[in-house]
């Protein structure tokens, strides 16, 4: 009985030992993680992202290192500037382990090392700058920190990707002064912008008034030109009308005289008839205010005979009678050239010179004034 119990205990110990051996001989390393393996206390190899077999009780995993980029934020550090002002600056460092073996064997804690190195480098960089330079040179400080840290941590198997200054806090008294200065600057800029706006508004208003006066002067000028041209053409047309009327009146009188003489010649009056007509006309002539006394000459009949001889010739009975004038004695009409000129007096067509003058005035009126605010209105005829 005791032997059976002892056998069971021994068997259980063997099973447990086998389980321990199997557990010690297998290591599963996930992706983006590296395992540093030692054999008998010395570095053996580095594995990542695989199932690794280990020699039990001989090989062991010294450390597991995360290969992803890490973001480490350090607490604010007091830093003294060149003008002896203390600033509290906190930084953020982005780094990645590239050589796991160096990160394990070259430094005991690379995170603490990065923090201390960042603080030291930050003090060296900011110590050579004034407060104003520190506040306005973040990119320059970040670049210097990254260059120094990347070079210093290279032997630790690290790669510094980026360094950022998260905040720069000056002392409370300096903050109050800065706030006052910022307020004064804002008020100054506001006053400058207000003055600039007022000046621009005044300039625009003056420019508008100037252009309005220019346009008004141009309009008055063109109106005066058109009025003068219209008056000139009106006078010309009136003169042409009066000339045409005088011509028509003279032509009518000439036609009347021509018809009268033609009628007289066609009637062939005798001296007795002319004497009778003269005597019939004497009472009407005597009614005038300037005609008081009329004397009939004794040789009146002889005078009529002489007048008749000029216009007629004696007939068979010895009496002078009027004869129609020959064709060549008839009044001749004016030449075609004169008729064409006279016909032009009665033409109602628009004078081309008037049309050209109006077109020129409209073109000048529509021409935009240099620097004007708009296009002048079109003048209509």
From Swiss-Prot:
Keyword terms of this UniProt record: Membrane, Transmembrane, Transmembrane helix
Entries under Pfam families matching the protein: Band_7
Membrane topology: Single-pass membrane protein
Stored InterPro entries: Band7/mec-2_domain, Band_7, Band_7/SPFH_dom_sf, Band_7/stomatin-like_CS, Stomatin_HflK_fam
UniProt subcellular location: Membrane
Family matches, as Gene3D superfamilies: Band 7 domain
CDD domains per record: SPFH_paraslipin
Residues that span the membrane, as ranges: 3-23
An example Gene Ontology CC term for this record: extracellular region
Main location per the UniProt record: membrane
Family: Belongs to the band 7/mec-2 family.
Record protein name field: Uncharacterized protein Rv1488
């Amino acid at each position: 009985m005791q032997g059976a119990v002892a056998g069971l205990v021994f068997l259980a110990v063997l099973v447990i030992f086998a389980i321990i051996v199997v557990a010690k001989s297998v290591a599963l390393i996930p992706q983006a993680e590296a395992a540093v393996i030692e054999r008998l206390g010395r570095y053996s190899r580095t594995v990542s992202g695989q199932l690794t077999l280990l020699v039990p009780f001989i090989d062991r995993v010294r450390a597991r290192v995360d290969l992803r980029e890490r973001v480490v934020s350090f607490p604010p550090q007091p830093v003294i500037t060149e003008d002896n002002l203390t600033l509290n600056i906190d930084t953020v460092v982005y780094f990645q382990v590239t050589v796991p073996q160096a990160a394990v064997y070259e430094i005991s804690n690379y995170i603490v090392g990065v923090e201390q190195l960042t603080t030291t480098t930050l003090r060296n960089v900011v110590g050579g700058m004034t407060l104003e330079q520190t506040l306005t040179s973040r990119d320059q400080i970040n670049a210097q920190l990254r260059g120094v840290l990347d070079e210093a941590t290279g032997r630790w198997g690290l790669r510094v990707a980026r360094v950022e200054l998260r905040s720069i806090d000056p002392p409370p008294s300096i903050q109050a002064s800065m706030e006052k200065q910022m307020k004064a600057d804002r008020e100054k800029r506001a006053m400058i912008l207000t003055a600039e706006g007022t000046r621009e508004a005044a300039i625009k208003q003056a420019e508008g008034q100037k252009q309005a006066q220019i346009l008004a002067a141009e309009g008055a000028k063109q109106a005066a030109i058109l009025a003068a041209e219209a008056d000139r053409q009106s006078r010309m047309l009136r003169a042409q009308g009066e000339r045409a009327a005088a011509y028509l009146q003279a032509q009518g009188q000439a036609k009347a005289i021509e018809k009268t003489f033609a009628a007289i010649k066609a009637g062939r009056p005798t001296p007795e008839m002319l004497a009778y007509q003269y005597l019939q006309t004497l009472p009407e002539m005597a009614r005038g205010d300037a005609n008081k006394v009329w004397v009939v000459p004794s040789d009146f009949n002889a005078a009529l005979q002489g007048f008749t001889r000029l216009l007629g010739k004696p007939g068979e009975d010895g009496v002078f009678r009027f004869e129609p004038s020959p064709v060549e004695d008839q009044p001749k009409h004016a030449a075609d050239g004169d008729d064409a000129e006279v016909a032009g007096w009665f033409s109602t067509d628009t004078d081309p010179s008037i049309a050209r003058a109006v077109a020129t005035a409209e073109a000048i009126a529509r021409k935009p004034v240099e620097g004007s605010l708009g296009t002048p209105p079109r003048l209509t005829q």
